[in-house]
Swiss-Prot record:
Belongs to the SurE nucleotidase family. It comes from Archaeoglobus fulgidus (strain ATCC 49558 / DSM 4304 / JCM 9628 / NBRC 100126 / VC-16). It catalyses: a ribonucleoside 5'-phosphate + H2O = a ribonucleoside + phosphate. It holds the Pfam family SurE. This is 5'-nucleotidase SurE. Keywords: Cytoplasm, Hydrolase, Metal-binding, Nucleotide-binding. Transmembrane segments: none annotated. Binds 1 divalent metal cation per subunit. One of its GO terms (cellular component) is cytoplasm.
Length: 261
């Protein structure tokens, strides 16, 4: 079994090492990850600059450090390092949860998983909740022990049973205070109330800082609600973003719209 492992926190992340240890007994693990922190880049791809790759040893792992995005890492991992589509692709373990439709489109962790799934690999994105702390300040203090057990258990099932029909990948979120149970969930619509703060640099020039505060509401059945109740949230995702609507309804919406050419 060949397993591709990547992340968006970079090759020195403790979560990457925890994932590597959890997966090592299940197959040959190829670690191909961004050389530096690339959180929040979504599924972005480097197309305007060359991508350089260095083979290094980090925390006992052989790592291919990619000077690019998590998506770049997936593509290089599949087509250059492994040379074929792996039996399983894992993105994580991310330091900080990736919940709601917001994370599905902005998270580098989920973006890498979407890319891997697009190429036909069974895929898992996995993240660990870090409440009320900064992922950039407390990286070394995170406890990945339970998240590692979760990853091992889910990965073993996916490797040998595959994914249910209609499911392209799993977005797994592990609570900081787990109750030991899983909940299959849907994506919440949003997790944050976004704000923009204007500031001045030392030279008096304006710049902006975008940040968000968590919403208090969380509908039952969503990934946010499950995590807050202590459940490991497993959200089945599909790549096709086409809305579930009868096309004739949409056609009727734009009835009569045409152009002379």
């Amino acid at each position: 079994m060949k397993i591709l492992l990547t992340n968006d926190d970079g090759l020195y992340s403790a979560g990457l090492k925890a994932a590597y240890d959890a997966l090592s007994e299940l197959g040959e693990v190829f670690v191909v990850a961004p050389a530096v922190q690339r959180s929040g880049v979504g599924r972005s791809l480097s197309i305007m600059e060359p991508i350089r790759v260095s083979e290094v040893k980090v925390n006992g792992m052989r790592v291919f450090a990619v000077d690019g995005t998590p998506t770049d890492s997936v593509i290089i991992g599949m087509y250059e390092v492994i040379g074929e589509i792996p039996d399983l692709a894992v993105s994580g373990i991310n330091l900080g949860e990736n919940l709601s439709t917001e994370a599905a489109t902005t998270s580098g962790t989920v973006g890498a998983a979407l890319e891997a799934a697009t190429h036909g690999s069974k895929t898992i994105a996995i993240s660990l909740q870090m409440p009320d702390v900064s992922k950039f300040e407390l990286t070394s203090k995170a406890d990945f022990s339970f998240a590692s057990k979760v990853l091992r258990g889910i990965a073993e099932i996916v490797l040998y049973k595959g994914l249910p029909e209609g499911v392209d990948l799993l977005n797994v979120n592990v609570p900081a205070k787990p109750n030991g149970k899983i909940a299959v969930t849907r994506l919440a619509r949003r997790m944050y109330r976004v704000s923009v703060e204007k500031r001045l640099d030392p030279r008096g020039r304006e710049y902006y800082w975008i940040y968000g505060e968590e919403t208090e509401d969380a509908e039952e059945g969503t990934d946010i609600h499950a995590l807050r109740q202590g459940y490991v949230s497993i959200t089945p995702l599909k790549i096709d973003l086409t809305a579930s609507v009868e096309f004739d309804i949409v056609e009727g919406w734009f009835d009569g719209l045409e152009w002379e050419v």
